[in-house]
């Protein structure tokens, strides 16, 4: 992979020479795509002779698309480039090694080891050795003297091993992250027409000249020019900063830009620029160049002694984000907030990360104090013994020997600190998450943000969509009401009047997205494939069941002949299509939610096909006798209607007038069966202490019936099922503002929210998260598929997007993508999340036992024997076992069903429970008893020479080798004990299902044998006899037996035990900190590319002078930028949005007639001024969506405004 800065565009001469091949060059198309509105239309018409002629120049057919000839596609890639923006160059292994070497404790060890190494070669002058006291208390032979350098060299070697292991782990982690990113990118496909067929193509395979089909919810992968569009609206805020949606049409503005979102409508475009030649790619290229320039400046600044800019906030991975104020006043406010934030403790988005950070700091402080006391005691004892008790003078020639002792003491202290500081915790978290993410892919969970995996383990509530998640999303019409008759099964075509049959067929075939269709089954005897919107597919299937052909209708009325299309959105809750009648005038077909469309009908077709009046009492009767019975059977009801316009040109922009006086053709009942595995999955959630709520756009009766089938509600339960309108009435005050107190009375009992908009979903999620009801804050997971589900997905602790039915916008806002759109996969995510939490707790139980024992042994040994029984290199080896191998073994335990039989841990539950504390202290007591017995009585028990008070460079003793070997073997068997943290007795349960664990334990044991038998002086070891090995092994196995003893002690009786590793409590959060956004450093680490994007988009205001096309007016505006976010919102990542503090008033779900009046008035914007609410479309008719987008207007003095006006 290459850095964007290394990619330069081809020179103009080369580009111009290629003009003959396609009739236009890359530069021509780039210049064309920089134009907007009338300028763009003039250029297309004057220079290219219209869009169709441009297609001819690009050798593509606007209807059939490219032929798909490999040679032609390859030529296009060579001439116009590939649709790839090169990612940031990954760090090399050597760079990661250098980063690992920056660890403070390792640096201290390196310095101490080098000093030890240098001084070991010093020999005091002969004859005066006796006066140096303790340094030469016993004579050394030549071999012992020569061995002095070995300890220093061994420490250096151990540090190198630790650094290499750390660098390798970082490298593999980054590789895995990039693999995950590549997987996500490969998942992204786009619809293009090739050789007359619509195919799904990976975004990277799109070339200039492709005819792309665009629809609601798409993220445009390349620049293009509109060929044909239906009510198309684009969100261009990612490039222009304008939050208002831009209406696209051939007459107004046909320019479509990569990185923008389709918020409404559909259409076709010809691709004109891809990759680094697209508008997004150009900005990326500029950012790469500006980054290179800045780095050069930084280097020069350092050489010349220029201080770096202080207005930079360092992120975790060292990327500096340049902060610029939005305007003068906001700049002051943001500066004050920044200062406050700098003083306050940061809250972690990930519950686990927050707890681990706090615990690591506590342990680190304790370790630092213990190591300092250890060094102090060793030095004081040495000084007092030599210079006070024995009254020896300080001789100059003895100074190097004394220094050697001080260095040795210092090394002991540092090794105590190294063992005490739990560096293995981040590694254990990374390994556990990476392992879980990899396995979750097999369970149809594509994790985009690593912390979401762990957060799911704490989930207490799931707000789920109905269609496709709880149901099969395999819709079919099973009942109908046509001509005053209710059919409980599909009627025969002979039963219907020809006129009515034709109206049904035309009303469905024409008034459905042409991308929705029924294809033959993939396997013989299988069900026909439904492509596109599943609701529309159900209606098309209804046409086929009536023995009619919708293809024939669409051939007669191709998409180009559609006069006007009102696409489905959350305000209309319907879709309407207008066509010209052969004899003059227009006909409009409408379809939508039955209660919405029927309210706009004033006539209905009777048995003879004649239109008869349809009054309010008739509508109420139909609702009572037709719609409600269908809904109670779990069917969704849709109404199909039409209207003829015979006189003149109607006011098409006045929807309130157009969408009235309809004639009802039919009402159909659509069945979407509940997935067979869902009831069991919801039962598991209930057992696991997770409340499942259904949030749907369906009728309240339909929603209640489906919820009952799923097991979300059971008859007789005291739970609420509300419609969005009633929900808003209950939670809002007279001003329309949400009151948390009112919401707190509703949400605990709410199980079904029907006829809801995405605003309602966001309000519910926010209300549950912000609620203070109960001891713990709720952890909420949300599913979403529509563009307008973005705010709710972002607000939730974990957002699940649908991989099949979900839009690109929803996927971008999500944390996890369900590749099978199945609720059962969410339950598996819960299981994996809890498993991560348990894996970290297992590792903690193991590591803290080692910490406690190693620190106490080193400290006590130093105080009593002036030496640590465990040498520096041995402790580094133990630390390596702890940090790497144990984390690998314990963090990769597979999950079990028992995880779902426990309640959620909660945000404030400690990482170290009382049971774990009992295990840690219990095993520490056993190990300390054994080690102290061996230290002070081991030589007598084994009948060997004592290793205590040995001279500085004396050879390794069997005594201390036995202590070291016993210590390691006890840790090894305690690793098996640590597999269980909830008091289970059978620690071997499922051990052979985890091959990694078995391999690590076996590998560590073999390594220990090699170290003891062949490690020699570097490891301060000597060979042991067979009987000594058996004793060591017996003591190690005693850990397993002792574990059973500890398990018999009831935890409740040990009330003196305290818990540790709590989350941040409410009392600990200051008032100033309450408003701060939660920051997830793991996410920032994962998505360095997006951080680069954000940084560059802000910095481009000062770097953009390199672009020659900008006029001089731009240079003035750059000096005083007033708009921070002019073009920053490319992928709308949550960590980059700036949440406004003011109260938000979402769109109320009022009477449809009132909404239509507001929306359809000319000049009315869909976003309110303080504006958080922009009504949008939804992919499926069953949900009702409304998007909240942040308004960041392009200021008249901003560089981007200059760019737009001057180009």
Swiss-Prot record:
Keyword Phosphoprotein belongs to the record: yes
Catalytic activity of the protein: Ca(2+)(in) + ATP + H2O = Ca(2+)(out) + ADP + phosphate + H(+)
Membrane topology: Multi-pass membrane protein
PROSITE patterns named among the record's database cross-references: ATPASE_E1_E2
Transmembrane segments: 101-121, 148-168, 369-389, 409-429, 844-864, 872-892, 919-939, 958-977, 995-1015, 1029-1049
Positions that bind Mg(2+): 785, 789
InterPro entries in alphabetical order: ATP_Ca_trans_C, ATPase_P-typ_cation-transptr_C, ATPase_P-typ_cation-transptr_N, ATPase_P-typ_cyto_dom_N, ATPase_P-typ_P_site, ATPase_P-typ_TM_dom_sf, ATPase_P-typ_transduc_dom_A_sf, HAD-like_sf
Feature: compositional bias, Polar residues: 1163-1181
All ranges on the Extracellular side of the membrane: 122-147, 390-408, 865-871, 940-957, 1016-1028
Sequence positions bearing Phosphoserine: 13, 328, 334
Region entry Calmodulin-binding subdomain A, spans: 1086-1103
Tissue spec: Isoform 1 is detected in brain, heart, liver, testis and epididymis. Isoform 2 is detected in brain (at protein level), heart, seminal vesicle and epididymis. There is a shift in expression from isoform 1 to isoform 2 along the length of the epididymis from caput to cauda (at protein level).
EC number(s) from the headed UniProt entry: 7.2.2.10
An example molecular function term from Gene Ontology annotations: ATP hydrolysis activity
Active site: 465 (4-aspartylphosphate intermediate)
Function field: Calcium/calmodulin-regulated and magnesium-dependent enzyme that catalyzes the hydrolysis of ATP coupled with the transport of calcium out of the cell. By regulating sperm cells calcium homeostasis, may play a role in sperm motility.
Subunit (UniProt): Interacts with PDZD11. Interacts with SLC35G1 and STIM1. Interacts with calmodulin.
UniProt name for this protein: Plasma membrane calcium-transporting ATPase 4
Gene: ATP2B4
């Amino acid at each position: 992979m290459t850095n964007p800065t290394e990619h330069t565009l081809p020179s103009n001469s080369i580009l111009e020479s290629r003009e003959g091949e396609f009739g236009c060059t890359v530069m021509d198309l780039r210049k064309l795509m920089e134009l907007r509105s009338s300028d763009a239309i003039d250029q297309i018409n004057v220079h290219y002779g219209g869009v169709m002629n441009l297609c001819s120049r690009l050798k593509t057919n606007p209807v059939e698309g490219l032929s798909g000839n490999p040679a032609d596609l390859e030529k296009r890639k060579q001439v116009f480039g590939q649709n790839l923006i090169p990612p940031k160059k990954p760090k090399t292994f050597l760079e990661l090694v250098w980063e690992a070497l920056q660890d403070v404790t390792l640096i201290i060890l390196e310095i101490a080891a080098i000093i030890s190494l240098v001084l070991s070669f010093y020999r005091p002058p002969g004859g005066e050795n006796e006066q140096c006291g303790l340094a030469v208390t016993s004579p050394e032979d030549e071999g012992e003297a020569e061995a002095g350098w070995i300890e220093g060299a061994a420490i250096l070697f151990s540090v190198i091993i630790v650094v290499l292991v750390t660098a390798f782990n970082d490298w593999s982690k980054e590789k895995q992250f990039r693999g995950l990113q590549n997987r996500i990118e490969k998942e992204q496909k786009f619809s293009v027409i090739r050789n007359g067929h619509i195919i799904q193509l990976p975004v990277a395979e799109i070339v200039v000249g492709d005819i792309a089909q665009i629809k609601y919810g798409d993220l445009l992968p390349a620049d293009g020019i509109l060929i044909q569009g239906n009510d198309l609206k684009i969100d261009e805020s990612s490039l222009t900063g304008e939050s208002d949606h831009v209406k696209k049409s051939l007459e107004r503005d046909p320019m479509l830009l990569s990185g923008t979102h389709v918020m409404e409508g559909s259409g076709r475009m010809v691709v004109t620029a891809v990759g680094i030649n697209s508008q997004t790619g150009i900005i990326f290229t500029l950012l790469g160049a500006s980054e290179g320039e800045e780095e050069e400046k930084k280097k020069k600044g350092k050489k010349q002694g220029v201080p770096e800019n202080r207005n930079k906030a360092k992120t975790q991975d060292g990327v500096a984000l340049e902060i610029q104020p939005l305007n003068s006043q906001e700049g002051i406010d943001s500066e004050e907030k920044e200062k406050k934030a700098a003083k306050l403790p940061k809250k972690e988005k990930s519950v686990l990360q927050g707890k681990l950070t706090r615990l690591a700091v506590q342990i680190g402080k304790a370790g630092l104090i213990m190591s300092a006391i250890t060094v102090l005691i060793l030095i004081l004892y040495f000084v007092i013994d030599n210079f006070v008790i024995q009254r020896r003078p300080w001789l100059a020639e003895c100074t190097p020997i004394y220094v050697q002792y001080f260095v040795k003491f210092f090394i002991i202290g540092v090794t105590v600190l190294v063992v005490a500081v739990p560096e293995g915790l981040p590694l254990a978290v990374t390994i556990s998450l990476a392992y879980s993410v990899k396995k979750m892919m097999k369970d149809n969970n594509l994790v985009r943000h690593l912390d979401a995996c762990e957060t799911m383990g704490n989930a207490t509530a799931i707000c789920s969509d109905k269609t496709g998640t709880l149901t099969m999303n395999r819709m079919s019409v099973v009942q109908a009401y046509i001509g005053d008759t209710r059919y409980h099964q599909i009627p025969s075509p002979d039963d219907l009047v020809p006129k009515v049959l034709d109206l049904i067929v035309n009303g469905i075939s024409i008034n459905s997205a042409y991308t929705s269709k029924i294809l033959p089954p993939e396997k013989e005897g299988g069900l026909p494939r439904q492509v596109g919107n599943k609701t529309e597919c159900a209606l098309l299937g209804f046409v086929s069941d009536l023995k009619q052909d919708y293809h024939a209708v669409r051939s007669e009325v191709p998409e180009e002949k559609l006069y006007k299309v009102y696409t489905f959105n959350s305000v209309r809750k319907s879709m309407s299509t207008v066509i010209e009648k052969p004899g003059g005038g227009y006909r409009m077909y409408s379809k939508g939610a039955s209660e919405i469309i029927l309210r706009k009908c004033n006539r209905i077709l009777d048995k003879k096909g004649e239109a008869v009046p349809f009054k309010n009492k008739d509508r109420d009767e139909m609702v009572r006798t037709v719609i409600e019975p269908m809904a109670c059977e779990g069917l969704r009801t849709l109404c199909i209607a039409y209207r003829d316009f015979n006189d003149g040109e109607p006011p098409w922009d006045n929807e309130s007038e157009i969408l009235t006086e309809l004639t009802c053709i039919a009402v159909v009942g659509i069945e979407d069966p509940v997935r067979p595995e869902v009831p069991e999955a919801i039962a598991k959630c209930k057992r696991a202490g997770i409340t499942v709520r259904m949030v749907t756009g369906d009728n309240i009766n339909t929603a209640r019936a489906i919820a009952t089938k799923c097991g979300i509600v059971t008859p007789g339960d005291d739970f609420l099922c509300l419609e969005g309108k009633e929900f808003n009435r209950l939670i809002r005050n007279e001003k329309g503002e949400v009151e948390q107190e009112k919401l707190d009375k509703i949400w605990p009992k709410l199980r079904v929210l029907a006829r809801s908009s995405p605003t309602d979903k966001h309000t519910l999620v926010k209300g549950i998260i912000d609620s203070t009801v109960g001891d713990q804050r709720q952890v909420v997971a949300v599913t979403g598929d529509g563009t307008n589900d973005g705010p709710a997905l972002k607000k939730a602790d974990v957002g699940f997007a649908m991989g099949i039915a979900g839009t690109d916008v929803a996927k971008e806002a999500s944390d996890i993508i369900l590749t099978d759109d199945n609720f059962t996969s969410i339950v598996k995510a819960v299981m994996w999340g809890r498993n991560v939490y348990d894996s970290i707790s297992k590792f903690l139980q193991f590591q803290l036992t080692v910490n406690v024992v190693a620190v106490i042994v080193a400290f006590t040994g130093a105080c009593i024997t002036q030496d640590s029984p465990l040498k520096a290199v041995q402790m580094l080896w133990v630390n390596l076992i702890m940090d790497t191998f144990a984390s690998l073994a314990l963090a990769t335990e597979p999950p079990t069903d028992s995880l779902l039989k426990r309640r959620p841990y909660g945000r404030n539950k400690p990482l170290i429970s009382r049971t774990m504390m009992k295990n840690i202290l219990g095993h520490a007591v056993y190990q300390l008893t054994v080690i102290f017995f061996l230290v002070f009585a081991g030589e007598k028990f084994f009948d060997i020479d004592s290793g205590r008070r040995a001279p500085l460079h004396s050879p390794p003793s069997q005594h201390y080798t036995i202590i070291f070997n016993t210590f390691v073997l006890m840790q090894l068997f305690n690793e098996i004990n640590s597999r269980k943290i909830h008091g289970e007795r059978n620690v071997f349960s499922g051990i052979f299902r985890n091959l990694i664990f078995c391999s690590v334990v076996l590998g560590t044991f073999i390594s220990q044998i090699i170290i003891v038998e062949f490690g020699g002086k570097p490891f301060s070891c000597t060979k042991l006899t067979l009987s000594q090995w058996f004793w060591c092994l017996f003591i190690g196995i005693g850990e397993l037996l002792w574990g059973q003893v500890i398990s018999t002690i009831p935890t409740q009786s040990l009330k003196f035990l305290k818990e540790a590793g709590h989350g941040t409590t409410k009392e600990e959060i200051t008032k100033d900190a309450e408003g701060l956004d939660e920051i997830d450093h793991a996410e920032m680490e994962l998505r360095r590319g997006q951080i680069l994007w954000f940084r560059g988009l802000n910095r481009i205001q000062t770097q953009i002078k390199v672009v020659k096309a900008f006029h001089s007016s731009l240079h003035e505006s750059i000096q005083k930028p007033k708009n921070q976010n002019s073009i920053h919102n490319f992928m709308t990542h949550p960590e980059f949005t700036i949440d406004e503090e003011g109260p938000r008033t979402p769109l109320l779900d009022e009477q449809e007639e009132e909404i239509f009046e507001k929306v359809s008035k000319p000049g009315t914007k869909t976003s309110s001024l303080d504006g958080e609410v922009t009504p949008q479309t939804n992919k499926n008719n069953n949900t009702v969506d409304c998007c909240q987008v942040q308004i960041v207007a392009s200021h008249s003095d901003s560089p981007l405004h200059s760019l737009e006006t001057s180009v």
